[in-house]
Amino acid sequence: MRLGVLDVGSNTVHLLVVDAHRGGHPTPMSSTKATLRLAEATDSSGKITKRGADKLISTIDEFAKIAISSGCAELMAFATSAVRDAENSEDVLSRVRKETGVELQALRGEDESRLTFLAVRRWYGWSAGRILNLDIGGGSLEVSSGVDEEPEIALSLPLGAGRLTREWLPDDPPGRRRVAMLRDWLDAELAEPSVTVLEAGSPDLAVATSKTFRSLARLTGAAPSMAGPRVKRTLTANGLRQLIAFISRMTAVDRAELEGVSADRAPQIVAGALVAEASMRALSIEAVEICPWALREGLILRKLDSEADGTALIESSSVHTSVRAVGGQPADRNAANRSRGSKP
């Protein structure tokens, strides 16, 4: 089965096309991205602006046509914190549905955490024992822990890299005092959640997912993406501390020149590093292993499982749409190929 997964994040919209079947390894066929910075397209009342919504709708419409031309049987479309937290999220979702035919759903933070954990568990298998997973997005930090495929603990905290950059580190480069203040604030914010997580049990394996963690690992010496997903990559607490001291003195333009840091992520990588550092400190983790699978893969796996046993894809909700029901004619296949990024 060929599936399309449309991920509307705080910074980017990402379409992943995969060939997948139950019991098999989902095979990525193409990846298409657009940088919208949706989290920044909000007004003083917390609403996504008309311009931001218009850009989102245009991008989703384009990507839905790419999914059709790629031969996808279904398109699973979901949004994370930028849409979820917006005051007018329902209005935006309604516009997307009416103008594109795509049923975009704002995932609950807990579902985001659970689906990511499912992907991590499937990647490492049962022999990994208790897994603790950290995932830093633009708007939130997800923390999950468990010994099964369903985590015992699944938290979503408003500690995303983009959110904290806007709220705490407006200067470029950020001032030392602001960095120190954010460190102290993060320690306080993570004190109670970390107790909840550790009470469930100490992890046998600490894992991290998300582009933020992959970039941080690369900056501290992990293998580049071209080495493939099965190469072991780790991020240590000591390496992270040294990295923060280095990148916090750089401008966003200079950080964007570093290998592993894209131009759209460069402004928020310092805040992301501080969240990673504080999370590892609060949970007494000295190193995390970087998992190449995350939320998108978790959604694909849950989709395949739900078709086999007849359960709901996500409790009380659905995030899939028949691509054939999407309005508009299939896009020109060559145009779709030209707009695709490199394979993950």
From Swiss-Prot:
GO molecular function: exopolyphosphatase activity; pyrophosphatase activity
Catalytic activity: [phosphate](n) + H2O = [phosphate](n-1) + phosphate + H(+)
Enzyme class label: hydrolase
Chain positions covered by the region annotation Disordered: 319-344
Any Pfam family matching the protein: Ppx-GppA
EC number: 3.6.1.11
Task performed by this protein: Degradation of inorganic polyphosphates (polyP). Releases orthophosphate processively from the ends of the polyP chain. Prefers short-chain length polyphosphates as substrates. Can also hydrolyze ATP and ADP substrates, but lacks GTPase activity. Cannot hydrolyze pppGpp to ppGpp.
Protein name (database record): Exopolyphosphatase 1
Natural source organism: Mycobacterium tuberculosis (strain ATCC 25618 / H37Rv)
Name of the gene this protein is made from: ppx1
